[in-house]
C-alpha cells in the first residue's frame, strides 16, 4: 500500500525542516512548497534543502506579482489597518500560500496539507480556514502544534536526524517578512514596556539616524493602482519594493502595536512597513480629492470590515467578494499623482492632482474669482436646520406646558 502524500508549506527554517522528517516518520511522503512573496528568499536553496532533509518533491514559486496584485492591492485600496495600526503583513500572505498548497495537493494527488504554525498564533486559523474553504476534502496537519516540543527538544531532534540548523538560530526574535512589510515578535519585545532595540529592525533606520534632508517622491495611480514612482512605471510589486527602500531610509513605517489576537490573547508586535504606510497615506489623499462626500464617509465602514476579515483568516469567505465589489467600484476615478515628503519617520502629503478632482478652486476660493453663490446659503441653512428647529420648538412648548401644570397643581 502506497504512502499518503502531504503538501507542506516550507520556509527552509528549523520548524518546517524538522516537520519534513517528523511527517516522514509518521508515514507520509512529504511534498515541500516554498513561496517567495517578497522577503528576498533564495528559492533554489530552499528547494534543495527540502530534498536534502527528506521531501520526495520540492516546489518553489515566485509569487511576488500575484501577491501584490491579488492580495496586497485590495488591502491598499481598503486602507486596511487592523485596529487602525497594523497593515496586515503576514495575514495577507496566508490565503495565497493556502491557495498554492491546495493547488499542488490537487495536482499531485496528495491527501493532506501541513503548515508549521504553533497552537498560540493567528496563522494556524488563517491556514486551516482557507484550506477548508478551498478544498474541504483535504486533511490539515499541524506538526509543530502537535509535537509541542521546547526549542531545545526540537534542536536535539534536528541534530539526531542530521537536519541542518540555521546559523541565525540564536536570534531571539520571530520574524515574518514579505513585500508589504516585516513583523517581529518574541524576545525582549514580549515586554510591552521595553523599548525595541535597533537590532529588531531591518527595513527602517532610527529617526535619529535618518537623513537631515527630506526626500520628495511622486506616486502615480490609475484607478486606485500605484503605477509610477517619480515618473517611472513599475509593476505593483516592484514599486512597493522600491518604495520600501526609499521610505525605509527615512525611518518611515515603524509600528509598535499591542494587538488583540484572534485566539483571544494580546500580543506585542513590532512592524516595519515603509512602502505600505506611504502608499496607504498617498492613496487616501487621492481619494479625498476624487470621491464624493457620501462615498468617502461610508467607505471606512467597509475598510474596517475588510481589515478584520483579512486578520481573522476569512479571505475565502462569501463576504470577501461582496466587499471587494464595493471597493472596486470606488476606485474608478482614483487616478492622479500624489507628492509625498519623506522626513524623519514621517510621510507627509504635500500635493495631489487628478483629472477627476472634485475640488473646484473657483468655488473654494475667497478671492475675487469666487463663483460660489453666497445667497444660496440662506435657503440651504433654513432647510438644513429645519428638523432641529422644529424639535426645539415642540420641546420648548411642551416644557412650558409642564411648568404651568406644576404651578397650578
Swiss-Prot record:
One of its GO terms (biological process) is L-arginine biosynthetic process. Its EC number is 6.3.4.5. Pfam families: Arginosuc_syn_C, Arginosuc_synth. It catalyses: L-citrulline + L-aspartate + ATP = 2-(N(omega)-L-arginino)succinate + AMP + diphosphate + H(+). The keyword DNA-binding does not apply. L-citrulline binds at residues 86, 122, 126, 174, 183, 259, 271. It is found in: Cytoplasm. ATP binds at residues 9-17, 116. GO terms for molecular function: argininosuccinate synthase activity; ATP binding. Keywords: Amino-acid biosynthesis, Arginine biosynthesis, ATP-binding, Cytoplasm, Ligase, Nucleotide-binding. Pathway: Amino-acid biosynthesis; L-arginine biosynthesis; L-arginine from L-ornithine and carbamoyl phosphate: step 2/3. NCBIfam families: argG, PRK00509.1. Homotetramer. Belongs to the argininosuccinate synthase family. Type 1 subfamily. This is Argininosuccinate synthase. It comes from Halalkalibacterium halodurans (strain ATCC BAA-125 / DSM 18197 / FERM 7344 / JCM 9153 / C-125). The gene is argG.
Amino acid at each position: 500500500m502506497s504512502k499518503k502524500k502531504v503538501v507542506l508549506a516550507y520556509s527552509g527554517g528549523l520548524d518546517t525542516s524538522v516537520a519534513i522528517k517528523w511527517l516522514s516518520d509518521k508515514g507520509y511522503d512529504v511534498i515541500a512548497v516554498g513561496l517567495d512573496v517578497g522577503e528576498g528568499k533564495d528559492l533554489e536553496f530552499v528547494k534543495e534543502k527540502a530534498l536534502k532533509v527528506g521531501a520526495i518533491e520540492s516546489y518553489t514559486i515566485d509569487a511576488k506579482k500575484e501577491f501584490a496584485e491579488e492580495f496586497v492591492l485590495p488591502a491598499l485600496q481598503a486602507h486596511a489597518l487592523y485596529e487602525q495600526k497594523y497593515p496586515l503583513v503576514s495575514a495577507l500572505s496566508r490565503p495565497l500560500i493556502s491557495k498554492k498548497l491546495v493547488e499542488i495537493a490537487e495536482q499531485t494527488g496528495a491527501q493532506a496539507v501541513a503548515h508549521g504554525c504553533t497552537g498560540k498564533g493567528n496563522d494556524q486559523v488563517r491556514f486551516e480556514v482557507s484550506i477548508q474553504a478551498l478544498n474541504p476534502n483535504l486533511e490539515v496537519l499541524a506538526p509543530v502544534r502537535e509535537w509541542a516540543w521546547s526549542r531545545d527538544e526540537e534542536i536535539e531532534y534536528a541534530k539526531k536526524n542530521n537536519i541542518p540548523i540555521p546559523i541565525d538560530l540564536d536570534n531571539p526574535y520571530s520574524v515574518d517578512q514579505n513585500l508589504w512589510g516585516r513583523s517581529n515578535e518574541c524576545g525582549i519585545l514580549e515586554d510591552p514596556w521595553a523599548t525595541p532595540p535597533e537590532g529588531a529592525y531591518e527595513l527602517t533606520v532610527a529617526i535619529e539616524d535618518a537623513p537631515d534632508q527630506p526626500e520628495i517622491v511622486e506616486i502615480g495611480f490609475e484607478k486606485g493602482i500605484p503605477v509610477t514612482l517619480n515618473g517611472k512605471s513599475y509593476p505593483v510589486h516592484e514599486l512597493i519594493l522600491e518604495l520600501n527602500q526609499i521610505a525605509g531610509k527615512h525611518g518611515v513605517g515603524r509600528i509598535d502595536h499591542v494587538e488583540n489576537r484572534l485566539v483571544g490573547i494580546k500580543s506585542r508586535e513590532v512592524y516595519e512597513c515603509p512602502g505600505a504606510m506611504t502608499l496607504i497615506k498617498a492613496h487616501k489623499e487621492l481619494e479625498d480629492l476624487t470621491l464624493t462626500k457620501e462615498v468617502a464617509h461610508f467607505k471606512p465602514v467597509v475598510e474596517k470590515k475588510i481589515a478584520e476579515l483579512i486578520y481573522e483568516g476569512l479571505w475565502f469567505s462569501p463576504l470577501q467578494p461582496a466587499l471587494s465589489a464595493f471597493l472596486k467600484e470606488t476606485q474608478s476615478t482614483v487616478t492622479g499623482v500624489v507628492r509625498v515628503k519623506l522626513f524623519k519617520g514621517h510621510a507627509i502629503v504635500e500635493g495631489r492632482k487628478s483629472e477627476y478632482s472634485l475640488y473646484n478652486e473657483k468655488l473654494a476660493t475667497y478671492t475675487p474669482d469666487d463663483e460660489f453663490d453666497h445667497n444660496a446659503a440662506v435657503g440651504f441653512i433654513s432647510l438644513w436646520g429645519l428638523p432641529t428647529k422644529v424639535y426645539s420648538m415642540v420641546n420648548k412648548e411642551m416644557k412650558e406646558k409642564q411648568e404651568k401644570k406644576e404651578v397650578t397643581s
